[in-house]
């Protein structure tokens, strides 16, 4: 099974609790997402000048890119209260009502994984977002009655990694949709350098670059790798984290020069050696790796596709020549028709 403790997983792990100290506290400290950051600053400044609640905000993007951090920054920049929860935690309408009725004027309510809200909870959320009212049914049967409760004007900040799972009525109620993208190596270098400074760990420019190159475009992974490399530097009594220390530490942790770990390499090697580079169906790969299909599609494949190691074609998964070079293997000669005309249209399997 896919190990949730993978060092390069973008999902939150238990040891990421230490990331709180590394998080930027305001938009000026936040690195990357330049356009999103600039737009947010405009919307926040305008709401503050008008003394109004900010329009509801939806952050969309892969895990680990700073959606929660930005939500906290929004509240801090507005100078208002911040309450955080997640979609799966709000089990029934009463749970949501309790959260909403305790909000003060212009407060920020952050709902992570908002795509996982149940339909019954969503129905209660619609009038709350649009009219700042709760429509609740009190009692059951003939004695049931509808009650309207006025709410303080608040800002809902939602975060999702799966925008396609949001219902249209919910998505349309967010006035400020913002998509977050993967970070460049230069941006991650700045994040690693700042993180090392916060941790009180000297780091050289090439040491920060080495960590950034292997962080898969994701600040959460960069912070995690930095903490582990710092352990190796401390154990070796190194004066600073330089490229050689970072390279040794990350090699020992099985994170290679492209940021791939043992699971990624196993996936690529299986297609290369067992299936001639593909095409091979995702169900076949799930059986070969003893992994659920969802884990392959949502956890393993996205970064490999982003790096240009893998293509999803109408006939299945296909390794690129770039992947064979990374594995140190000779690429087979293939019919160009294997790549398909329209890219990722799903498996035949």
Swiss-Prot record:
Entry's Gene Ontology cellular component terms: cytoplasm; Holliday junction resolvase complex
Residues reported in the UniProt entry to bind DNA: 293, 312, 317
GO molecular function, one term: ATP hydrolysis activity
Binding site for Mg(2+): 68
Binding locations of ATP: 22-23, 64, 67-69, 130-132, 173, 183, 220
Main location: cytoplasm
Region (Small ATPAse domain (RuvB-S)): 184-254
Oligomeric form and interacting partners: Homohexamer. Forms an RuvA(8)-RuvB(12)-Holliday junction (HJ) complex. HJ DNA is sandwiched between 2 RuvA tetramers; dsDNA enters through RuvA and exits via RuvB. An RuvB hexamer assembles on each DNA strand where it exits the tetramer. Each RuvB hexamer is contacted by two RuvA subunits (via domain III) on 2 adjacent RuvB subunits; this complex drives branch migration. In the full resolvosome a probable DNA-RuvA(4)-RuvB(12)-RuvC(2) complex forms which resolves the HJ.
Protein name from the UniProt record: Holliday junction branch migration complex subunit RuvB
Residue numbers spanned by region Large ATPase domain (RuvB-L): 1-183
Gene: ruvB
SMART domains in the record: AAA
Keyword DNA damage: yes
GO BP: DNA recombination; DNA repair
Organism: Rhodopseudomonas palustris (strain TIE-1)
Ranges where the record places region Head domain (RuvB-H): 257-349
Subcellular location field: Cytoplasm
Domain topic, free-text comment: Has 3 domains, the large (RuvB-L) and small ATPase (RuvB-S) domains and the C-terminal head (RuvB-H) domain. The head domain binds DNA, while the ATPase domains jointly bind ATP, ADP or are empty depending on the state of the subunit in the translocation cycle. During a single DNA translocation step the structure of each domain remains the same, but their relative positions change.
Similarity comment: family membership: Belongs to the RuvB family.
Keywords: ATP-binding, Cytoplasm, DNA damage, DNA recombination, DNA repair, DNA-binding, Hydrolase, Nucleotide-binding
